[in-house]
Amino acid sequence: MSGHNKWSTIKHKKGAADAKRGKVFTKIIKEITVAAKLGGGDPDGNPRLRTAIDKAKGENMPKDNVERAIKKGVGGLEGTTYEETTYEGYGPGGTAVLVEVMTDNRNRTVSDVRSIFTKCNGNMGESGCVSWLFDKKGLLVFPKSIDFDKLFEASIEAGADDVTDEDEQYEVLTDPAAFHQVKTALEGAGFKAESAEITMIPQTMVKLEGKNAENMLKLMDRMEDNDDVQNVYANFDISEEEMEKMM
């Protein structure tokens, strides 16, 4: 299984995704608000907002919530002002970790993030210490029920960089600038993605087992539980056998 999707698969198996639905809504609302503030309230002219709205639809978020977040972003409603930043560090076993946050209190957030790193046998690093180990990409995930050859052909024709056949799904990778063009073209050709996002994909993976694997999952869980954290990316790989031991 490709590493960049390892964490979402693990969460699904643990049944953690549904339990954190409320937090997912909160994070998407923040993203919509900031995207609208920076690029305007029209998704057609604001790719970042369009991606956030698509994510909201994928989570079945009520339309009212989406519209309220856009209004707040463009100044139609009073609300908290968020600052975006990315923290970098090392997880168990020398893994590389990127933590994207949106916060109204940077001091609180940096303290929380540093504490999570420390408690999970990792440490927070300087800006730039691990970001070079990741590439920003558009990622579309498709079910195995569709025809791979047809998906491959349509994806490359639409401008995708690569299409891979993974253990449990097909993955289409794009340049971030071509993400919406590829997604729209594939939808037009009848291919419905299970998920579609701009993400950070690790160039190399670090295999973890035993205590390191346990601490890594704990770190990912705690980071995602933090209200200020929007996304966490890490280059760990844990085998199916190792996962079974921990569950």
Swiss-Prot record:
InterPro entries: Integrase-like_N (IPR017856), TACO1_YebC-like_2nd/3rd_dom (IPR048300), TACO1_YebC_N (IPR049083), Transcrip_reg_TACO1-like (IPR002876), Transcrip_reg_TACO1-like_dom3 (IPR026564), YebC-like (IPR029072). Pfam families: TACO1_YebC_N (PF20772), Transcrip_reg (PF01709). GO terms for molecular function: DNA binding. It comes from Citrifermentans bemidjiense (strain ATCC BAA-1014 / DSM 16622 / JCM 12645 / Bem) (Geobacter bemidjiensis). It comes from the Bacteria. The keyword Cytoplasm applies. Belongs to the TACO1 family. One of its GO terms (biological process) is regulation of DNA-templated transcription. Keywords: Cytoplasm, DNA-binding, Transcription, Transcription regulation. This is Probable transcriptional regulatory protein Gbem_3313. It is found in: Cytoplasm. SUPFAM superfamilies: YebC-like. The keyword Metal-binding does not apply. GO terms for cellular component: cytosol.
